[in-house]
A protein has these predicted regions:
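Short, surface-exposed helix-loop/turn micro-motifs enriched in polar/charged residues
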Residues: 186, 283-286
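Flexible domain-boundary/linker segments
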Residues: 114, 129, 223, 285-286, ...
């Protein structure tokens, strides 16, 4: 069975490193070198189907290495077909990797989620006479506009309270975080969902400040802290494999052969885009769908071929791993 390489991340090192049997499937974790950087990998069957429950092993491996090294973390489940595939990644992305390693050197990520306690609304009702009056009137009438006005007043009061809390929270954290990224908020109870970039030496001070905040807002806010983590949200590099069927369908949509250049892809796309643009076919209900398919096909192939040899033959596509800028 062919042996692939499971990729965890990239570190700065001038010689091969071994980290023990801490990888997926208890595999040995080591580095594959290119000049002054190394890919942290473990051997794995090339057609191995990584199980979702092994994501925890992936995370633990990164955290273990992070104890003594700065590592650019890679997403879960990336398998290169062979060692040369990994070496090619390092060659193509060396300067991006080095710049990112410098940016996150000796730093870690801490995720903080802060939610309202369910008593906060009651506090606002008690403190705001105008809302109390509107609430009492709304209970006595079916007047919809009054209820809408009440809802707006409550939202405004909540927003004001949120701004007060956020100002205080950021003031107490001070300059301990070097950077922060806002994560998606999926419910109304969440006040803040953020990732903070913190110097390793200041980790405990950051935790102490969070404890100070938790104590201060004990019956008002709930704090959830996850970390320390590798700085996923503060690296601009993303590595992905491209699915052959996706690439092949895109090739066929544009009517291309298996060996193409980026200039050929551009030329064919421009011709097809002009020919099938929806503005030129106002009476065709499928024109927009056709144009979208052409545009999507171009984006797939442009991503694949921009910096690499453009062979769309099956084995070449399956061997290729893309190095891309993350989309914030």
């Amino acid at each position: 069975m062919e042996t692939g390489r499971y990729l965890y991340g990239v570190i700065e090192t001038e010689r091969r490193q071994s980290f023990g049997n801490i990888g997926v499937g208890n595999s040995g974790v080591y580095t594959i070198q290119y000049k002054d950087i190394g890919a942290v990998v473990s051997d794995i069957p090339v057609d191995y189907k990584v199980k979702i429950e092994e994501a925890m092993t992936h995370e633990k491996t990164l955290r273990k290495i992070m104890e003594t090294r700065t590592i650019i973390p890679m997403g879960f489940g990336i398998i290169a077909r062979n060692e040369s595939g990994i070496t090619n990644i390092l060659k193509r992305g060396r300067m991006k990797f080095k710049n990112t390693l410098e940016k996150i050197d000796n730093k870690l990520q801490i995720n903080v989620k802060i939610s309202w306690d369910n008593t906060i609304l009651m506090d606002i009702l008690k403190e705001n006479e105008e809302i109390q009056t509107l609430s009492a009137k709304a209970k006595e009438t079916a007047n919809q506009s009054l209820k809408i006005e009440l809802g707006k007043k409550v939202k405004s009061a909540l927003d004001e309270r949120k701004n007060e809390y956020m100002t205080d929270i950021h003031g107490i954290l001070g300059d301990l975080p070097i950077g922060s990224k806002q994560n998606k908020i999926t419910d109304q109870d969440t006040l803040m969902n953020a990732s903070f970039l913190v110097d390793k030496e200041k980790k405990q001070k950051f935790y102490d400040k969070l404890q100070e905040l938790e104590k201060k807002y004990e019956k008002k806010l709930k704090f959830l802290c996850v970390g320390p983590l590798p700085p996923y949200n503060f690296t601009e590099i993303e590595i992905n494999k491209i699915d052959f069927k996706t690439a092949d369908d895109a090739r066929k949509t544009l009517g291309l052969g298996q060996e193409v250049s980026m200039s050929e892809i551009d030329s064919v796309y421009n011709q097809l885009a002009r020919k099938y643009h929806p503005d030129l076919h106002p009476d065709d209900p499928l024109a927009e769908e056709k144009f979208k398919k052409i545009k999507n096909a171009y984006e797939v192939l442009a991503k694949y071929c921009e910096h690499y040899l453009c062979s769309l033959e099956k084995t070449k596509v399956e061997e290729t791993i893309l190095i891309q800028e993350k989309i914030s």
